[in-house]
Amino acid sequence: MPTQLFTTTDDVVLTGRHWVRTDAPRAAVVLVHGFTASANDPAVCDVAEALHADGVDVVCYDARGHGTSEGHSTLGDLERHDVAAAVEAARERNDRVVLVGASMGAIAALRYAAHADGLAGIVSVSCPAQWRLPRNVQGVLAAGLTRTRVGRAVASRWMGVQVAPRWTNPEPPIGLVPRVQAPVAFLHGAADRFVPTSDAAELYEVAGEPRRLRIVSDMGHAFAPQSVPAIRDAVDWALAVEVRA
């Protein structure tokens, strides 16, 4: 699949990949990875290849501050501009675009969708409802990496992620979802140790119709082999229902 460069409206250059169908695609999917991931991660590629086999074009990219893209990660805030650039690229071949985002990527997708029209659907995977972290090892690690100077240095040196120096405290997903004017499916792993399944239920409760909630029994956090069948099914569902007026 060819490499592609996207430039966001705030002048950040992103490195992307485009899985292009040789026949006429039935839609396009923009795949938005989570924190510390990239477009080249095996789990991300597994999702992209499965969706591509289902008859859609797939656009994926390294979010700002990740992989070979420019900029600094803001954990789903300014990443809305990344999503916008990828959607624009996807629409060069197909107007029907579904966003599939995981964790930080789901936050970015919902933030973009709350102010956008014309999406065919959104699949939100492992998305938090509020800005709260679990009181376990995973929560302490996430807080340390993103909210302390030492943690940001560790993320840069050992994980290749450039984190913005300050947390912007943007509106949480629970406030964004009611403004989304597209079919939205919430997927969550029952074995997720970062974000509890109750967050998915909270987001589902405030979403408009059409909406869908699925808890996957053997799935953990974000993109993983166990999430692929559920994501494929959710994309099919989104494309089968009518977009709300």
Predicted features and spans:
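Conserved alpha/beta-hydrolase "acid-adjacent" motif
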Residues: 193-199
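Short beta-strand/loop motif that positions the catalytic acidic residue
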Residues: 180, 186-188, 192
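Hydrolase active-site cap/lid region
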Residues: 115-166, 176
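The serine-hydrolase catalytic nucleophile loop
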Residues: 36-49
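N-terminal cap/lid segment of alpha/beta-hydrolase-fold proteins
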Residues: 1-23
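Catalytic nucleophile-loop/oxyanion-hole region of alpha/beta-hydrolase
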Residues: 64-93
